[in-house]
Amino acid sequence: MAPRKKNPAIKSSGTTSSKASPLPDWVKGGGPKPPPSYTKAAKQQQTQSAGNDTAISATGSSSSSSPVAAASSAGGGGGGGQGQPREMLFPPGSKTPLNMLYERVNKLPGWEKPIVEPRRHKQGYSCAVTLKKVNKKDASNPFTVTFEPKEPTLRLECQSSLEAKHWGATYALFRIFNHLSLNLALPPGPREYWVKMEAYKKTAPSHQDWMWASDPFEAAAKRDAEKAKKEQDKLAAADAASRGEVSIINAKLNGAAKPLSKAWQEAKEVRLASSLREKIEATIRRAMSIFPSASAAPLDLVEEDQDADTAAPNSTPNIDAAGLEKELTSYGFRRGHARSAISWLTSARIALSNPSSSSTTAAALVDPMLASAASLADREAALEYLMLYTPEEDLPARFKPSTTSESFVTSSKAGASGDALAVGWAVDKLSKQAGLPRKAVQAVFKRIAAAEHERNVELPRLVKEGLALEMMLRQMAGWDSPAQAEEQWTSDAILDAVLFFPTRVNDADKEEIEIKRADERMAVEAVLGDDRVVVPSEHQRLGVQDYDVTIAGPGTSVGGTEDVRLRISSHPQALYPLARDKTHAVALPAFCVVSKTLPSYLKLALTQHLLRAFQGDNRRMDWYDAIEAGDGGIVLSLVEELESMWSKMIDDPPLLSSVMQYLVGPDSAESSVEATPETSRAATPTGPSRIANKRRTGGGRALRRDAEVDAQLQRQQRQLHTSPSYSKMDETRRSLPAASAAREILGLIRSNRVVIIAGETGCGKTTQVPQFILDEAIEAGRGSECNIVVTQPRRVSAIGVASRVAVERGEKLDGKKKAVAPGSLVGYAIRGERRASRECRLLFTTTGVLLRRLGAGGDTDLKGISHVVVDEVHERNVDSDFLLLELRELLRRNSRIKVVLMSATINQETFASYFGKAPCISIPGRTFAVEDHYLEDIVQQSGFRPSGNEWRGSARGGKQIEQEIGQLRAHLQAQGVDEETCKAVESLSRSGGRISYELLGAVVRYVVERAENEELSGAADGDVGGAILVFCPGVGEIRQAIDAITTSVRGQSKVEILPLHANLSADEQRRVFQPVGAGRRKIVVSTNVAETSITIPDVSYVVDTGRVKETRFEPESGLTRLVECWASRAACKQRRGRAGRVRAGECFRLYSRYVDEKKMAAQQTPEMRRVPLESLFLEVKSMREDEDVKEYLNKALDPPSLASMDAALTNLIEAGALQSDRGYKSRLTSLGKHLAQLPLDLRLAKLLIMGTIFGCLGPMLTVASIMSCKPLFNTPFEKREEASKARASFAAAGCRSDLLADAAAFEEWQTMRAQRKTNGEIREWCESHFISQSSLRDIQTNRLDLLSHLQEMGFVAPDYSAFGVYDDERYDMNAQHAGVLRSVILAGLWPAVVRIDVPSAKFDQSSSGTVQREAEARQVKYFDRNGRVFLHPSSTLFSCKGFESSYLTTFAKSSTGAGADSKVYLRDATEVPLFALLLFGGKLKINHFAGGIGIGSNQSGGDAKDENWVRLRANARIGVLCAQLRRLLDAVLDHAIDEPQDMFAVPGCKDVLSVIGQVLQRDGLAA
């Protein structure tokens, strides 16, 4: 600081240098130093000074000190005005608000020093604090916010600028740091101000929340963006209001009415290209005439905002016409449209309620697309009519799309040049200005071009455009029709006249024409006034001398809400007004009605009305005479006519079909097909379906005594008994234990309706009991009354047993010829194959085939059957339990039929009680001794030691497995097993039950060597038996076992390895029963099909893995899966018994005694109690259409739980397989009838059906196989990121599906195999992509199995190849369209839908305004109906930042943790196209006020949380069209029940499937 100046004059005046601090008054005056301002003495002194300060001296100096207004703060600089003493605002040592603001802002990155500016106003001082932050994108333009307390209770009125600075700083501190308790550090004064601001914040409204943001710059950017949006919405609302439209602004209807929820505001908009919409409408009209039943089906559509009173269907002709008209017009419909809908509805109701009504009344139902509306509520029916028949541009705003899906540049103009481009723009002008259909205008221009070429004439561009309008007018009036007018009125006449205008019209006439047209325009201006005659802008003109005559319009002299103008056009070669005798065509003025507010069809209707006054039934002679004379003056007449009628026509518009009938073809115009009340009523779904009709009208031929047949059968029996080969076979049969019990068995059957036979393995019950019954009947002369059906649980069992019985009776079934010898008594029938003669009396079949015969097979009471023998009844699968239930009911209806139940391990008491204490008989077995070898025995005897390579990297650990291993060791030690063997058994047991193929191969090799040694030593008979039977759980395991055996067994030429499972053909299955060549040993590797019924006669050794695949329900996926688990002890006993049929045998069990005793259940749990019941429900409904399924299944041997039945009902209704109107009595839908024929999980079956009909069968076979197999990708914990990237590499652009990515991986593997890549290359590829080779093989096997099901039901042609490249046009036309594939996946998985919640948009400020910040993938949230869920990191969609749709469908869910910490993860997700939801989702619910469509549960009265779970913004017309397409799809499926392959040939079916496919390909957008 500079030294203070010493000059006395300066000192006395108080003047100092600019660098020196000013002198206080008490120094200059030489008085005592005043006390500090915050002391009591200072305050008393201020009071006294204020009271005495009243006089002012003449020199301008005060007579006494002025009151203290401001002073320096504690440690603060600055002062008051001149002559005022400085004041301390805060106690010494206080931290001032200003300093606190500087310090805290300085710590914030990028923030600049605050600018604190005091501002003076009338009441004192206020303060504004400006904050700035560095803008990294534009350093010269930092982000800026300003804080100034303007709230009434917080406004500053400080006495000094310094005080204002501190209080302003306090305000700024609170705005930024209100979440902190800074008031504790503030001095008195600002501290109380802080508390005051806290109180204000608590009571502040929610819209002021932005004020308390810790980052004011971000809050300001967001607020600016919201303000800009509101301004745009306000302008949009004003624009809509000016056009008389209704729009939704700020979540309200025109800024008023009820507010919309956040879900509706954020819903995605569905867009439908107008070209696609027209195609859909044309397809619906054509297809409804082919499928009239679809028109009568209930419309799967309701209105969400519909009142309860109006929701009920009205079947009477009584309609509140006035009230309904008022309601419809309140929605914005024109009064004429509303009246038309009410008139139609009234006629439709009369026609339906009175079948004898006149044909005129019945004509109300001329369009079958609307027949169903007659059974809807009044408003709903009227709205459907209006949605379908009101031109889209004339719909109220809430009912039509807000945006267009068409491209601005059409294909006709893209890349065009020269004349083509000029024609394109001319077409646009005529379409937009006159409202003419684009296709019709294009057709006229083609006619003009053809005429030019033919006559070698080239017209000027303006002439061609004017001529096109003149030709369109004549065509629209109908004068081109021979029955409508003379030749001179046609468009061809005017075309010819204009082409030859230069040669046929002389110069004088040309000049006269020009003069008359000019005079006429002057007359119009003189009569109407210059303000009503307007020249349109250049780009709107249709000719060179166009002018508009205003008829009505807001803001004009004539006024009116609608814009109506008559445009008069001319061109250089126009004929008007030329007399008729001077031209070959009638010379009319070229005119049209133009408007900014009217829809195109109303503009055309007004124009058409004026045209018809020249010619036809409505001809006005004065107009006609004026045209004939060529005097002109017709324009004023047109204006007068238009003025008198335009408002009436707009209020009550004509039908669109009458306006467009001459402009468009019949496919585009509204065509109709007449329907009568009788045809409509007959087609209603309340009538019996074809299946029900078959049940009632069908019926097998009842058994009758036929002496001729009896005699023939006895002759055959004698011939059999006298044949040379019979004696040996008879000897074999008599040696079976069943033969000694034959008399007792037959006696029980004769005297009882139901008999239970428990026969030990090998007793011969399966082959002999049916023959006992047949032989007795034939011998008694009653063979004609004997017809036996024997059911087997598997196809291979039915074939094997039938073949054996045929041999015993001297017949042959195992040949390659499909036909059997006439008169053969033994045959078999399996799904897709039947080998039996017409005289067959002993038919072996699968359980499912007999169930279908009971259902839709035409013999519901089995009147043509005398005995039903159910074999292996102990297995308790769903089909066998269902068959028992059906047979128990059948016994009441059919008094003659007999039922025999057989099994080796049957629980006699359970079955006897179920069938009313039916008698039981037991037959002892005839088997040789079988020696058991458990795992510990095998290891000890063979010396096998596991290498450890098989389980490396996959051995399971943990407390549970270690505890089990400890118990196993104790069990082994109790048997006296040595330590080395214990360790080997423990090592093999650590796999958790997984099969060791190294062990399996070694055991088979050991058995082969052991058998050879025994046979060489004579310990075993080498001529009898010696075959080895290996039991594996599934087809994939069979393949691996064969590989292991092939590798292990020495001298492979000495063994023949054969697989055996249900997927093999009948010929392949027969090979296992045939003997092998001398010196060779047969090894059969089989699933549990060889466990019962089938007897491979030469088996002496059984190798049992102890594993089986059971159908179980997985809660996390909700899918039926085949789960590998331990077999039951009863099943293993059956397997063991296979070894002792022909000689002493041995059973090698690849599991320990500990597993046998502790892990295996005694009996298998009935399948009906452990699997989902959807398939069973479908089967029951296909057989008993109106049955209460719950009540019926409660009669089963072991009824399923109520919870599982409720779940099945819900799932079937949601899947669209079951109607929802009658609960457990509801009928099957068309889709449900197809699903009932597929013995698959509901979702897989639906996926395959939909994939077939929509041309993507190949990919869906793969996807369905992936769903039913173990995961395709192996994900090691330590390489999760690499595995996820590998899976994502298969997700092609537009795929957006985990399942399709997996399918792409499988297809690449198939391609590598087709290219004959080496096993090493394929293995390396799999390892590099973390793909399981066993899963790939399983998927391939499953594809073949699934395809066979579709081919057996006739849905897919037999020549379709499962190994193709998706090039079959019938079934794979859409295989490359990701939109169709994702839609079909949604169809199969609905209602497993998850909502995507993208975070609210955030904005950054820039020099050009605010810019939206890109969202991060981790900010995207997902919600199902129960709350928030999470996408699994392995999903290919996990890193997606944005989605085209707002919904995903997921195949599986998994949960981690428990309680509040648990998270639900989604797996196998697929993004869902919006139209897929509309076409394949739940019930559609139109919300007119929200301008959207909700998609909820298919169930009536479903859970509230399921209602409108999916919300889409779309106009009601889209909802109605989608509902109509749904009904047509049902009709196509219904048609395909009898002729499934006709879907692709019948035009109606093909058109419906094609148009739906086109919609799904681009999600409603034009191609």
Swiss-Prot record:
Its EC number is 3.6.4.-. InterPro entries: DEAD-box_helicase_OB_fold, DEAD/DEAH_box_helicase_dom, DNA/RNA_helicase_DEAH_CS, DSRM_DHX29, Helicase-assoc_dom, Helicase_ATP-bd, Helicase_C-like, P-loop_NTPase. Residues 39-48, 55-73 have a biased composition (Low complexity). It comes from the Eukaryota. The keyword Hydrolase applies. Residues 1003-1184 form the Helicase C-terminal domain. GO terms for cellular component: ribonucleoprotein complex. A motif (DEAH box) lies at residues 871-874. Keywords: ATP-binding, Helicase, Hydrolase, Nucleotide-binding. The keyword Hydrolase applies. Coiled coil: none annotated. SUPFAM superfamilies: P-loop containing nucleoside triphosphate hydrolases (SSF52540). Residues 746-924 form the Helicase ATP-binding domain. GO terms for molecular function: ATP binding; helicase activity; hydrolase activity; RNA binding. Residues 10-20, 670-687, 713-726 have a biased composition (Polar residues). Residues 1-95, 670-734 are annotated as: Disordered. ATP binds at G759, E760, T761, G762, C763, G764, K765, T766. PANTHER family: ATP-DEPENDENT RNA HELICASE (PTHR18934), ATP-DEPENDENT RNA HELICASE YLR419W-RELATED (PTHR18934:SF267). Belongs to the DEAD box helicase family. DEAH subfamily. This is Putative DEAH-box ATP-dependent helicase UM11114. It comes from Mycosarcoma maydis. The lineage of its organism: Eukaryota, Fungi, Dikarya, Basidiomycota, Ustilaginomycotina.
